[in-house]
Amino acid sequence: MYNPPPPSGSQGNNNYYRQPSSTPGVSNPNPQANQFLPPQPSNTTQTPGGYPPQQQQRPPTGAPQQPGGYPTPPPPGAPGGYPPQQQPAGQYGAPPQQQPAGQYGAPQPAGQYGAPQPAGQYGAPQPAGQYGAPPPPPGGAGISLVKNQQISLTKEDPTLRKLTIGLGWDVNTTPTAPFDLDAVVFMLNAQGRVRTSQDFIFYNNKVSRDNSVSHQGDNLTGQGEGDDEVVLVNLQAVSPDVTRLVFAVTIHLADERRQNFTMVPRAFIRVANQETGRNICRYDLSQEGGPNTALIAGEVYRDPSNPNNWSFVAVGKGMQGALPGLLQIFGCQ
């Protein structure tokens, strides 16, 4: 009886097909069919590839043989044999001989490779005024401040004892109306007023009574890069009842010449450590003056909780009235 093959492609079915042993009409398989019988010895010559293998062919005569028919290996030490012969020192694998000093890897004589170029050849700053903004002053530009931002000078530089206050600007000069800007300082008490008129520091009163503030002179043109006017401050010498130092810039004869701070580009104030030259902070005033004739640039003031600590605030407040207006505000007679 024909038994069909098991169905193909079925999945998940664990019942596989087998022929039942009692199928009618099908005789039982020979019980001896699967019994192992050892092979009988035979004198019949096996064909190539049969088992057991035929007797090995004898090797050609004339060459000495080892038992089993294998060729005799080369004598010990022959080229290509193992172990390899001892190589002469320095030829293969041996460490290289010590090179004479200076041939390989020794440092080059000073000045041949990588030595710094002579000063002024590469990377030197361009002459003042040729390209864009002026180069940053020595010691880096310091922290760039924005309007009303405050900074603790003492925390930024714990060694700070003396200040350099630099004020700079450019002017749009005309042949008939030259610009003359002046930097001034007001030494104020806790009430926000000068104690006497001598607390007003400017080009005609360059040194304060306590010698703590010193004006370095008037720049009548505003020409050149960097600081146009400089004020030096000895913080340790400032009188105890002075709590604020106000730094301002005014335009001389502004009303007569019809001038204001819209005609003064690239104005700034910077604060530096006078003893080390390190710039602590810088405030760009170019957009702060507007159509005004006086500009309060910034203030150096005592820390209310510790009078020995000093801070700076970027004010940037433009005002009308030029210098006479500031004198009235701060109580100068």
Curated annotation (Swiss-Prot):
Ranges annotated as biased composition (Polar residues): 16-45
Keywords: cAMP, cAMP-binding, Nucleotide-binding, Repeat
Biased composition (Low complexity): 46-69, 87-132
CDD domains, per the entry: TerD_like (cd06974)
Cellular component annotations (GO), alphabetically ordered: cell surface; cytoplasm; nucleus
Any one GO molecular-function label of the UniProt entry: cAMP binding
UniProt region (5 X 9 AA repeats of motif C), positions on chain: 87-134
Region listing for 3 X 5 AA repeats of motif A, in residue ranges: 48-83
Chain spans, region 2 X 12 AA repeats of motif B: 84-107
Domain of life per record: Eukaryota
Region annotated Disordered, chain positions: 1-144
Positions of A- repeats: 48-52, 67-71, 79-83
A matching Pfam family: TerD
C- repeat extents: 87-95, 99-107, 108-116, 117-125, 126-134
The keyword Nucleotide-binding belongs to this UniProt entry's keyword annotation: yes
Subunit and interaction comment: Heterodimer of CABP1A and CABP1B. CABP1A/CABP1B could also associate with p31/p34 to form an active complex.
The protein's name: cAMP-binding protein 1
